[in-house]
Amino acid sequence: MVIGLIGAGNMGSALARGLGEPLLVVDAERSRAESLARELGGEAPDSTAELCERADVVVLAHKPAQLDEVAAGLRARPRAVASILGATSVAALERAYPDLPVYRFMPNVAVEARRGVLCYAPGTRAGDGPERELLALFGRVGAVIELDEPLIEPATALMGCAPAFYALVVETLVDAGVHHGLPADRAGLMASEAMAGTAALLTEHRLEASALRRRVTSPGGSTERGLAALERAGMRAALSDAVDAVVEVGR
């Protein structure tokens, strides 16, 4: 299956690198498309129209405001259109591509490391397209979770922004470690590896988050004291407010 990528920005590039195979790439900045295509052993066609003539599936990763403009430039019909555009509904995609099966995906940046999460809502004609092949392809870069479309926005707030939220936690832990005398590079390694190990326990060992927290927390111990400080500082409320703020933007 030949994949054509329209848009080589942060998320489009992350997805392409995670897939790790030659793609056809176009972008408003041709040099950016050429650079990504060269990195992956793919090609940068001269136009969107040429890309669509050669691609089986077109992945939309351009700016959402360009949806109608890009759709108007298609002369050939790919087998399907997969969108990773933010705040762009299935209905909007089907208006732009009225004769094609469309699929709405919302990935997070961890797809680049093949540990991403991709929420997914199929269009009304999805069954007419290469849905199984597409899900298998995207499943190579992370967990693909089908949702009713109204849940895509809150899911994006949870998993799409989560890498930045978690990175802020690591950043804060590193700063605290440095404050207490640890070298920054070693503090960074310890904090990031501790987070990676925690994620492995939650996903690979199927532990509930609350169960893991209780398992690490000994009565009267240092972890209990640290958690109490986090509760006093309002960590739960802060994270909940962050998700609420992102969901509000998407409405």
What kind of region is each of these model predictions?
Residues 1-57, 96, 115, 178-180:
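NAD(P)+-binding Rossmann beta1-loop-alpha1 motif at the extreme N-terminus of oxidoreductases
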Residues 22, 55, 78, 141-142:
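Short, well-ordered alpha-helix to beta-strand connector turns
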Residues 33, 51, 67, 183-190, ...:
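Small-residue helix-packing motif on alpha-helices
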Residues 39, 92-101, 117-155, 166-204, ...:
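Internal alpha-helical scaffold of NAD(P)-dependent oxidoreductase catalytic cores
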Residues 47-97:
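Rossmann-fold NAD(P) dinucleotide-binding segment
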